[in-house]
């Protein structure tokens, strides 16, 4: 047991409960309040909107004092997570000058701590609730650029085609999934839903979800891979049509060729499955 800011904070060593998650978050916030290098803190994600469920993680954003960078504080906070709360590993993700350090605890809880330079700390969406201190004026959140998503979609499709044709079924599965992932992101952007990591996919209209379901590989066989690939690239072209009809028109011919040659370079033309 450790004490932070007058609170008793128990080390977590088993599958976590919602109460344990709440207690740990309160302890981390209390520690931030007495850390002179932290000027403000906010809870982000589902915790900011009180929409957590039993599987939600802890997601806290810290505003560093003026002139400080994440390297100034990260070692102390990392030590705290390992020594007091049973962290077993962590992953660093940088976004500009902001460091997101993602911890995995022995209880299987995920704890995301982000360290923001003074001048960049602030809300970029609705999932931001200030706990103490002050934040900069909110900025508009940015969705992935649709043209970039389309580009990644056809790039995965190129490699899906060659993987199927070479009989490399597991690699083909990976590539077909990549096409589908970008179709999902495009659909989420189009419907105003969170586009990262499939967060909005289950809130898409039923007909869109049905189209996405058709891109799943049912069995690891050439025929099933080819069917899923055809459906995935068809869905990609359909999403492109919603955003840039001219681009969709230019992509149709190479898309048809990808589907045709997925069975090998000498494959005969088949019935046109693309719109």
What are these regions (language model features)?
Residues 5-6:
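Residue-identity detector for glycine
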Residues 9-36, 47-49, 55, 62-113:
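Metal-dependent nucleotidyltransferase catalytic core
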Residues 40-43:
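Hydrophobic/anchoring residues in structured secondary elements
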Residues 53-56, 124-126, 201:
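Short aromatic-enriched loop/helix-cap "lid" or pocket-rim segments at secondary-structure transitions
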Residues 115-120:
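A short, sequence-level motif marking secondary-structure junctions
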Residues 122-148:
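A short, charged helix-loop
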Residues 138-275:
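Conserved nucleotidyltransferase catalytic core and NTase-mimicking acidic/glycine-rich helix/loop elements
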């Amino acid at each position: 047991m450790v004490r932070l800011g007058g609170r008793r904070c128990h080390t977590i060593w088993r599958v976590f409960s919602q109460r344990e998650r709440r207690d740990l978050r309160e302890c981390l916030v209390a520690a931030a309040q007495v850390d002179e290098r932290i000027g403000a803190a906010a809870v982000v994600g589902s915790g900011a909107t009180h929409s957590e469920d039993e599987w939600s993680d802890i997601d806290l954003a810290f505003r560093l004092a003026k002139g400080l960078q994440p390297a100034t504080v990260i070692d102390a906070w990392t030590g705290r997570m390992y020594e007091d709360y049973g962290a077993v590993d962590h992953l660093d993700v940088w976004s500009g000058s902001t460091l997101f350090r993602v911890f995995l605890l022995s209880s299987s809880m995920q704890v995301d701590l982000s360290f923001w330079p003074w001048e960049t700390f602030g809300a970029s969406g609705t999932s931001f609730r200030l706990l103490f201190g002050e934040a900069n004026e909110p900025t508009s959140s940015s969705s992935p650029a649709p043209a970039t998503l389309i580009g990644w979609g056809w790039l995965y499709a190129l490699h899906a085609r060659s993987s199927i044709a070479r009989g490399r079924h597991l690699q083909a599965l990976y590539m077909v999934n990549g096409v589908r992932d970008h179709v999902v992101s495009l659909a989420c952007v189009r419907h105003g839903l969170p586009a990262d990591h499939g967060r909005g996919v289950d809130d898409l209209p039923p007909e869109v979800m049905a189209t996405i379901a058709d891109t799943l590989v049912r069995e690891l066989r050439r025929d099933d891979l080819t069917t899923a690939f055809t459906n995935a690239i068809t869905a990609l072209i359909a999403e492109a049509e919603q955003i840039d009809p001219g681009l969709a028109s230019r992509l149709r011919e190479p898309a048809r060729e990808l589907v045709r040659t997925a069975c090998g370079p000498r494959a005969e033309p088949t019935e046109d499955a693309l719109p």
